[in-house]
């Protein structure tokens, strides 16, 4: 095991991150810089967890993934988040549809909330209970279409 190898440092950072040690994870990722896209991705996940959304967006730039869309949403770019998740392979998953519903909620788009929740729930019925109490959808809790989707 070569502790000076940047990929090893990246993997050590991932281990620290899984253990919840964000400080050492960040240090390991920083020393692994230049080792490839995996390092930037791991740094971005840490950035999201630490609330550094603009840095996460930068580290995920061009990834067209769930996490890039999430980082954009959390940084306030609702349209960018929707474009990113819609263009990604993740957009066709249950969680991708759920994220689209959250983005729609933040945009005030009732039709988007309902249609995306229905799609998400059709792919993973377990999302019904999550959606029924998710504060992102509080504006729609009394809406008959929302209630029908999550029952």
Locate each region found by the language model.
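Short coil turns that delineate tetratricopeptide repeat
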Residues: 3, 34-37, 61, 90-93, ...
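Canonical tetratricopeptide repeat
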Residues: 11, 42, 67, 99, ...
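Start-of-helix register in tetratricopeptide repeats
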Residues: 7, 38-41, 63, 70, ...
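Register position in tetratricopeptide repeats
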Residues: 18, 49-50, 74, 106, ...
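Terminal, low-structured helical/coil segments at or just beyond the last alpha-helical repeat
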Residues: 122-151
């Amino acid at each position: 095991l070569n502790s000076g190898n940047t990929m090893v440092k990246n993997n050590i950072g991932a281990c620290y991150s899984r253990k919840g040690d964000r400080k050492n994870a960040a240090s390991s990722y920083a020393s692994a810089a230049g080792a490839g896209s995996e390092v930037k991705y791991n740094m971005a996940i840490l950035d999201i967890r630490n609330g550094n959304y603009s840095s996460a967006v930068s580290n995920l730039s061009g990834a067209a993934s769930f996490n890039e869309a999430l980082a954009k949403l959390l940084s306030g770019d609702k349209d960018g988040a929707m474009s990113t998740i819609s263009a990604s392979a993740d957009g066709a998953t249950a969680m991708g549809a759920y994220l689209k519903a959250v983005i729609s909620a933040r945009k005030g788009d009732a039709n988007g909330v309902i249609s995306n929740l229905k799609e998400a729930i059709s792919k993973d019925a377990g999302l019904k209970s999550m959606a029924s109490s998710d504060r992102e959808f509080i504006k729609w809790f009394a809406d008959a279409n929302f209630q029908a989707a999550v029952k």
